[in-house]
């Protein structure tokens, strides 16, 4: 997966040429994308109710709910809870993004948003023992 701030369709072509089979699209940053024409999967990232409603038009895409407000950088897991209610009719998996630091965070999202997929980056990268942290996440009993 290629995660970048896609602002031009050329970047989609470039990602595909480098072997990406999926790109992450921040819905607030784009109007239209070339991904479908290139047969590349898309992960549509949303943070607001309006973006969530728009994302439902991307029927073949995965949808990620970013708990981090990209304007203020504040994180709230309640974003996933709130937006999952709008997105519950989407036929593909939803992904909870940002703000996952512990088993309790994951259990909260599963219980309150019924999301079972997570994009975890920061808490792994900031961990002093990435392997141990990853093992802790993998062993969560839901």
Where are the predicted features?
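A general structural motif
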Residues: 4-5, 45-48, 73-79
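Extended hydrophobic secondary-structure segments
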Residues: 1-26, 33-42, 50
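C-terminal helical cap(s) of enzyme catalytic domains, especially alpha/beta-barrels
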Residues: 77-87, 124-142
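A cross-domain feature marking catalytic cores of carbohydrate-active enzymes
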Residues: 2-4, 27, 44-46, 67, ...
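Glycine/Thr-rich beta-alpha phosphate-binding loop at enzyme active sites
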Residues: 56-85
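Glycine-rich phosphate-binding active-site loops on the catalytic face of alpha/beta enzymes
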Residues: 12-32, 64-73, 113-134
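Catalytic cores of alpha/beta
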Residues: 7-19, 47-59, 90-120, 132-137
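Structural preference for beta-strand elements that scaffold enzyme active sites
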Residues: 1, 21-24, 39-43, 61-64, ...
């Amino acid at each position: 997966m290629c995660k970048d701030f896609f602002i031009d369709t050329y970047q989609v072509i470039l990602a595909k040429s480098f072997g990406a089979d999926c790109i992450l699209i921040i819905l607030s940053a784009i109007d239209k994308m070339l991904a479908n024409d290139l047969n590349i999967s898309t992960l549509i990232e949303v943070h607001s109710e309006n973006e969530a409603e728009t994302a439902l038009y991307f029927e073949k895409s995965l949808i990620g709910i970013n708990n981090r407000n990209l304007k203020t950088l504040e994180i709230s897991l309640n974003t996933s809870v709130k937006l999952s209610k709008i997105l519950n009719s989407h036929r593909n998996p939803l992904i909870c993004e940002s703000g996952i630091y512990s088993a309790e965070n994951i259990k909260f999202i599963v219980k309150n948003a019924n999301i079972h997929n997570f994009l975890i980056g920061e808490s792994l990268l900031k961990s002093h023992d990435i392997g141990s942290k990853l093992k802790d996440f993998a062993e969560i009993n839901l």
